[in-house]
Amino acid sequence: RRQRQMCIRDRAYCFAAEKHCNQKRRSGEMYINHPVEVAIILADLKMDCDVVCAALLHDTVEDTETSLADVSGLFGDTVAELVDGVTKLTNIEVDSMDEKQALTLRKMFLAMSKDIRVIIVKLADRLHNMRTLAALREDRRLFKARETMDVYAPLADRLGMSSIKWELEDLSFFYLEPDAYQRIARMVAESREVRE
C-alpha cells in the first residue's frame, strides 16, 4: 500500500511538473516549486496520500489546460474533488476586507467545502504564498496579509492547526505592522541572549 501511494504521489508530481513546465511565479522561480512546497507542508502534517496529491495538482485545473476529468481519470475522484474544491475557494474574490467580510468569507469557505481537507490544502497553499509574499506589489502584500490575518489564521485556529495559525499570523504581522514586528523581534533576541 505504501509503495502504491508513493507511486501515485510520484505520478502527481510528474504530471504537475509537466503541466507547469513553462510557468514561473512572480518571484521568477519555477512554478512547480509552489505545489511541491504546499505538498511538503501537508506531508509534514501527516496528511493522507489524496491530500498530498491534491496539493501537487491544486493549480493544474486553474492555471493549465488540464480539466477536472483529466485529474479524475488519472488520480481518482477523491483527488479531483479536492482539487475542484481548492479551485473554487481560490476563485472567491473580495475587494475589501472588513471584519464582516472576513466572517462571511470564513463561513463561505466552510459551507462550500464538503470535505474539510479542501480547507486544509487551501491553508497550506496560503501559508506557502505568505512565505513568498515579498514578490508582490506592496498593495497586494498588504491585502493578502490582512486577508490571511482575518480569514485564514482564524480558520486554521478553528481546525486546531495551531502551528499553521501561528505562522500565518506571524507572517501577516510582519507585513501589516513592520515596525512593531521588528521591535518585538529585537526584544525576543535580547531576551534569548540574557537566558543563554
For the regions a language model picked out, list residue spans one by one.
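Active-site helical microenvironments for divalent-metal-assisted chemistry
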Residues: 1-5, 9-196
